[in-house]
Amino acid sequence: MLQAAAGAWADPPPTEATPAAPYLLAGAPTFDLTVVKFREKYNRDNPKLPIGEFRAIPTAEDDSPLLTRAASKLNENLYASTALEKGTGKIKTLQITHLPLQQATEEKAARAIAISYMAALMRQFEPALTVEQSQNKVNSLLEKGKGSRFYQQQVGAIRYVVSDNGDKGVTFAVEPIKLALSEP
């Protein structure tokens, strides 16, 4: 089942297939991680769910001049994307976007592959989770975010975001957040 995703291409998705992240907060922190280091570790940890090289996406007029967007095509209906801080190349968000297929029989398998990628991404930030636990957690987040342009859940210093755009696809994102000390 996962072999269909084994060939990861580096071609960026069409611009219309990668909506700008409306949930990426202005002034959001970065992970202390570049996309090259992330891919090295991710691909070493997930050899059956590889992410190919990220390619820059041409900027649109409404894009932030402080960010570089990049994407990697995983298969015909699945993309990994990121927003990087200009100058440092540090990651502000990592995303997996699943574009639904018209054929119901193919969509079930495609969705299972997408969830596997989303769960693998989650385990990069919560390494204590098992494959099953991470898949259950992703399914729960997708269910809670179903039909919502923005659903988030905070876990420590990160947040998971689900952006459901209906027939245009669903995006699962991982982003760092600023932790504030509570006042006594």
Question: How would you describe each model-predicted region?
Answer:
Residues K168-P184:
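Short, low-complexity, Pro/Ser/Thr/Gly-rich segments in the mature regions of secreted, periplasmic
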Residues M1-L2:
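Sec-dependent N-terminal signal peptides
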Residues T93-Q95, Q152, R159-V161, T171-A173:
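Ser/Thr- (and often Asn-) enriched beta-sheet segments in non-cytosolic proteins
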Residues N46-G87, P127-N165:
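A cross-family detector of function-defining hotspots
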